[in-house]
């Protein structure tokens, strides 16, 4: 994926100005900067949720994007772990149960089968969210503040999964203000300047 001179505005306010990035297949990148400076907007622009004022985002053929957002709405909604992971499957097929199981194994989350998603800890939810991404067979992962709201134990669990991504044949952009991610991951770091 290539981003060329991306500019994004909300009304007349410039949120992103002349941002460029050339992401190669398999490359892992952390975009580091304070909250409220447009990092999430960048991900939403890549996804096409937010329209760019100018600039280009160029994707490789057959780019499949998986997005892990930082918030979990409707905490009382009774959705199971398997149902969350199944959201990554575009079409129900005869192998969908096997695909879900394989994705949970890949995310080291098979022990969470059968549980309600909102009964899980923050770190466990992030593992399940990664399993959903794996189920999409995505080659580009967008992670929005993936370690936010995690206690120390949950963060350590999730860091293991982030390290596992290093061995996957996918590209990753993680946006964060968490210095611990930078210290614990040997990824390219881009300092976000608004």
Predicted regions located by residue number:
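Helix-to-loop junction immediately C-terminal to a conserved catalytic motif
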Residues: 47
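Conserved ABC ATPase "signature" region
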Residues: 97-112
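Conserved ABC ATPase signature
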Residues: 116-120, 124
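Hydrophobic anchor residue at the start of the ABC signature
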Residues: 130
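H-loop/switch region of ABC-family ATPase nucleotide-binding domains
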Residues: 176-177
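Helix N-cap at the start of a conserved alpha-helix in ABC-type nucleotide-binding domains
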Residues: 152-154
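Catalytic Walker B motif of ABC-type/P-loop ATPase nucleotide-binding domains
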Residues: 141-145
């Amino acid at each position: 994926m290539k981003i060329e001179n991306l500019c994004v505005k909300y009304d007349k306010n410039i949120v992103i100005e002349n941002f460029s990035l050339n992401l190669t297949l398999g490359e892992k990148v952390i975009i580091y900067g304070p909250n409220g400076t447009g990092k999430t907007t960048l991900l939403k622009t890549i996804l096409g949720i937010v329209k760019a004022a100018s600039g280009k985002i160029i994707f490789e053929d057959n780019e499949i994007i998986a997005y892990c957002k930082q918030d979990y709405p409707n905490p009382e909604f009774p959705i199971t772990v398997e149902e969350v992971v199944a959201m990554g499957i575009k079409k129900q097929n005869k192998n969908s149960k096997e695909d879900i199981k394989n994705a949970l194994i890949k995310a080291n989350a098979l022990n969470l089968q059968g549980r309600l998603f909102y009964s899980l800890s923050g770190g466990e939810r992030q593992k399940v969210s990664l399993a959903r991404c794996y189920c999409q067979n995505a080659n580009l992962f967008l992670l929005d503040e993936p370690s936010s709201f995690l206690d120390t134990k949950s963060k350590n669990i999730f860091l293991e999964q982030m390290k596992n991504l290093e061995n996957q044949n996918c590209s990753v952009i993680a946006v964060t203000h968490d210095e611990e991610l930078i210290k614990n991951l040997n990824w390219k770091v881009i300092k976000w300047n608004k």
